[in-house]
Amino acid sequence: MNGLHDMGGQQGYGPVLIEAHEPLFHGEWERRALGVTVAMGASGLWNIDLARSARESLPPLDYVQGPYYAIWTKALQNMLIERGLITADELAQGQPLTPPVAGVRVLQAAQV
């Protein structure tokens, strides 16, 4: 099955343009997006394969428009909502509206 995430090697897309001296992250938000996504893996509610599937299941336009780490952020948001850790309203308002889910593992700073 080839989706938009399987573009590598397909005809008609042209070469991959490599930015000389490209930084690992183009902004602090990208660093945080990756960090939060990886840290949430400690919850035990998903693994690397499910996280990848969540990214690959996004609408195709999400892959071709916007920054790379926006894909990671949107997939994380979807996984958090699907597993009941946050609601869509909480995400939209940027604050908790319901009590935290009990029994979810939390990554502690000492574990990093």
Outline where the language-model segments fall.
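A charge-rich, low-complexity, intrinsically flexible signal that marks solvent-exposed coils, linkers
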Residues: M1-V112
